[in-house]
């Protein structure tokens, strides 16, 4: 018997109900950065030059560039274009990077739980240890921000077989680990539905540039092509376009220039008035407010206490 996840049923996008995003918009556009902290010379972590290179001072420093330099250039770019953003954050980032959080708060951006550090993978943990990890991250963000995060993105999209169950039980409303659709859909958990918000495995600078060896111009072209195609497709159905950015990758000057041009193309597009420039939590709030049957999958009942 083929192993199955049991989290959602098959649903062709052509057979689903139509609806509009807030304000009659048709394409929801999200930018999500990944703000990460790594162990020095230990654990997991990418290398900018050599695939599979052991952890050393060079690849540690390259990744730290994102927090010291890259994210600040991204903040400025988002400000210039008037774009909101969400940020997948490792909770250990709070230990030494207060200025990053000050800027996020000033921009009123969203924080998404992203594990403690990208040097570990929650998919390798026993249930009790994974629950402890999720609780640790949630409690840290709640303590520092006054409220827990609504969403979760696993470090390197890592999940165990129980992750959606544990997230639902910890109070999370959505997850971004399942790149199976261009629309949000409901995941089944042992404690009720959990929303899956689209997050890209492909329109992702780490996947494109580090793993597929594309350059900054290639990645920017992907953004433009994705936007142009999805703005056309969204005439038939409401869609979500999410861009995943890592500050130590796209924040390098030779790539940042191309990202700026791509995002300018999007905000200046003739059909930009049909776009909802938003965040994953706003998408989740919208979906939870819909009556049963609108969002694919088995969602919350009509009882508002379950929303």
Task: Please place each PLM-identified region on the residue numbering.
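Active-site beta->alpha N-cap acidic-glycine motif
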Residues: 2-110, 228, 258, 265, ...
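Active-site-adjacent pocket scaffolds in enzyme catalytic domains
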Residues: 2-23, 139-237, 291-296
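C-terminal domain-boundary segment and adjacent tail
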Residues: 12, 174, 224-307
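Metal-dependent polysaccharide deacetylase catalytic core of the NodB/CE4 family, i.e.
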Residues: 53-55, 72, 79-160, 192, ...
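Alpha-helical structural signal in soluble globular domains
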Residues: 77-81, 103, 107, 140-144, ...
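Conserved strand-to-helix beginnings and helix N-cap segments that scaffold or border functional pockets
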Residues: 97-98, 161-164, 253-259
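Acidic, His- and aromatic-enriched active-site or binding-groove loops in soluble protein domains
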Residues: 108-120, 131, 168-183, 303
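Alpha-helix N-cap and loop-to-helix initiation/capping positions
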Residues: 125-133, 214-218, 254-258
